[in-house]
Curated annotation (Swiss-Prot):
NCBIfam families: DapF (TIGR00652). Pathway: Amino-acid biosynthesis; L-lysine biosynthesis via DAP pathway; DL-2,6-diaminopimelate from LL-2,6-diaminopimelate: step 1/1. GO terms for molecular function: diaminopimelate epimerase activity. This is Diaminopimelate epimerase. It is found in: Cytoplasm. Pfam families: DAP_epimerase. The gene is dapF. The record marks H159, E208 as: Could be important to modulate the pK values of the two catalytic cysteine residues.
Length: 274
């Protein structure tokens, strides 16, 4: 199997062309490939498939290192877009793809930056999914060690965002797993911890479901900014600093799609026997 190793701000991926190759990924194969000591090593496996809809260019599949399939990965989407252009699978710079839960528009820029139309944030609890009677800007979520005030949103995958005073000393190693598997999230959740610098600048760390804390989480950055705007503490254009680097997020509010812009880096190509 031919593959490419890529990363978006340190969030690393193996990207596989399933348009010109016949590939199949059982859970045990994904886990073996994800092993950083005995396999290739990655946060997520991204698979480029032929479009399910003739009006689209590709279908985009995402698997976590534990073998679970998820419906969204913003950093992965940027790498996906660069991959299909680099490999000559398309000559378009505006690429339309489907995911397990919707559609995305990806725009490859000349400076290796990619802008992703992430769609409109989803706030209805039953669509996230999140166990709550109605939408609220802030939810009280109780864990074994702490009661938290959180914003909850879906960017195609569920996110729980908590504001912290100091991102470096936030108790993410403990709170991340507790939120990820909290009973109010039937499909588990990505837990984001946001420090607000000013109305146009935040720092963020994300504990991703199925992957743990990563260097960067694109959909997590989108979720944090959307929550901050909804809560009235952020403006419409926000710089997000993650451990792996910087993303720019723009959202004009309800009724509008959210845009994420950031780097997508190709590291190397390889061949492995499955």
């Amino acid at each position: 199997m031919q593959f490419s190793k890529m990363h978006g701000l340190g969030n690393d991926f193996v990207v596989v062309d399933a348009v010109t190759q016949n590939v199949y990924f059982p859970t045990e194969v994904i886990k073996r490939l994800a092993d950083r000591n005995r396999g290739i090593g990655f946060d997520q496996l991204l698979v480029v498939e032929p479009p399910y809809d003739p009006d689209l260019d590709f279908h985009y599949r995402i698997f976590n290192a534990d073998g679970s399939e998820v419906s969204q990965c913003g950093n992965g989407a940027r790498c996906f877009a660069r991959f299909v252009v680099l490999k000559g699978l398309t000559d378009k710079k505006e690429i339309a793809v489907s995911t397990a839960k919707g559609k995305m528009m990806l725009r490859v820029k000349d400076d290796d930056m990619v802008c992703v139309n992430m769609g409109e944030p989803i706030w209805e609890p039953n669509k996230i999914p999140f166990n709550a009677n109605k939408f609220e800007k802030n939810y009280i979520i109780r864990t074994d060690i702490q009661t938290l005030l959180c914003g909850v949103v879906s960017m195609g995958n569920p996110h729980c965002v908590t504001q912290v005073e100091d991102i470096q000393h936030a108790n993410i190693e403990i709170l991340g797993p507790l939120l990820e598997s909290h009973e109010r999230f039937p499909e588990r959740v990505n837990a984001g911890f946001m420090q607000i610098i000013n109305r146009n600048h935040i720092k963020l760390r994300v504990y991703e479901r199925g992957a743990g804390e990563t260097q960067a989480c694109g959909s997590g950055a989108c979720a944090a900014v959307a929550v901050g705007i909804m809560q009235g503490v952020l403006d419409n254009n926000v710089q997000v600093d993650l451990p792996g680097g910087r993303l720019m997020i723009e959202w004009q509010g309800k009724g509008h799609p959210l845009y994420m812009t950031g780097e997508a880096t190709h590291i190397y190509d390889g061949v492995i026997r499955l």
